[in-house]
Amino acid sequence: MKSQPRPRSLFRIIFGRTTFVILGLLLQIAFFFSIFRWLGNYIHFVYAVYVLISASIVIAILNRPMDSSFKMAWIIPVLVIPVFGVILYVFVQIQFQTRALAKRVSQSIEKTKPYLIQDENVHRQLRLASVRSSRLVDYMNHIAGFPVYENTAAKFFPLGEDMFEQLMKELKAAKHFIFMEYFIIDRGYMWDSILEILRQKAAEGVEVRVMYDGMCCLMLLPYHYPQKLEKMGIRCQMFSPIKPVLSTHQNYRDHRKITVIDGHTAFTGGVNLADEYINRKERFGHWKDTAIMVKGDAVKSFTMMFLQMWDAASSKSKNEEDYGRYLVPVDYKLPEGYTGDGFVMPYADSPLDHEQVGEQVYLDILNQVKSYVHIITPYLILDDGMKNAMAYAAKRGIDVKIIMPHIPDKKYAYLLARTYYPELIASGVKIYEYEPGFTHAKIFVSDDEKAAVGSINLDFRSLYLHFECGTYLYRNCAVADVENDFEKTLKKCIPVTLSDCAHYNWFGTKAGKFLRLIAPLM
């Protein structure tokens, strides 16, 4: 039985936190505009200063080490929107809260480094299997700080409901600790079922921690929901709660989806903890999502990812934790029925270190592909590097296929995505739309050897502005399952042609092209 959306009372809508956040932002915007009007009395002087500052900022933007799409997105408002564009840019560049968050994230990562040391024997085995793939591991070791592992089994789930069933079993079997970190938690069948298990486990003495992104406090959960969980014995934190303050600090969201159980089992993928992700509630037709479970040595990285973000989410002073007690035992053996073949490398991406780790994984797959690369993504808002890599792969004869939603969750993102269709199709990329509904999966699979499954979308927010995570697989048996699911999903899709693109709604096409100019800032 599908769950129904919870009705919101008029009182909660009017006096809820969302309303106060919006009012606070509007008041601050009104204050800035009143300053602009006052400056209008000195228009000639202000205009001369504005032209000088604008020119200086444009030169600075052009010389900054950033993607050209971001440069264009900033130059347009600086030149086109008088005064406000300049103030917006300066405002974004001097954000003390963001610097404080970056410092906490950096410190928490440093604390976990001793637990994420690459086993050179494993690295040597991968180098013997594939020198090219070992180069990606070199990058991960030196830049991102995540090792590659053997002795790890991976199980791929083609739907959220499949993942949910397995997750419930694993949670019930927990003996020592449960860590859960999600972008979205919403009350309903899925979360209520999980919460009941967490409550029971906490009562049994199992350490339970839950962390979710602060966006939830706007529409989905009460602001003081963490206190409710604390009363159940569940430690809980919100990452970066939304506040009625103009700040780019609030732009960096925790988009990750991670569960770690007893240090030996972990889940990640696209599935959040809400009913639409398991098709208990219909929003945009059938919800196609994917997830992956890993068991074994590689879970160590997911454990450290969670602890890194848990520490960074709190600005309060905290005692030093013994992270070692959360690691998988050295003598851990995979359960019967699980095979630890190939190589598994979990990884995380932070928007605060100027390294697009998630994008580099995708680009590495595209640049090394020999036969095919198949992609499922909910969004297609690409920077030049990603777009060119896809086009170049197709032009050299690689089978590049992308599955997109046919029923989008965000109309503006859909209009934006369709502006990329013609140039990609013209270069040889094949694009399909999932006719039954919405694809929320984020997968790359290539050459029957490699796959990446995680939380990372093909858009600027995921690649540049969100905290993300994923799992890279090389010659692991789960790679075949990812490709098989892609082929099954493809049978439910509509191919998109250049003729289709030419007949899209005129207004929608023009709107998409306009939005593309500022897509990196959205």
Feature locations, PLM:
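Surface segments flanking catalytic/ligand-binding clefts of nucleic-acid enzymes
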Residues: 430
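Catalytic-core elements of nucleic-acid end-processing and repair enzymes
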Residues: 442
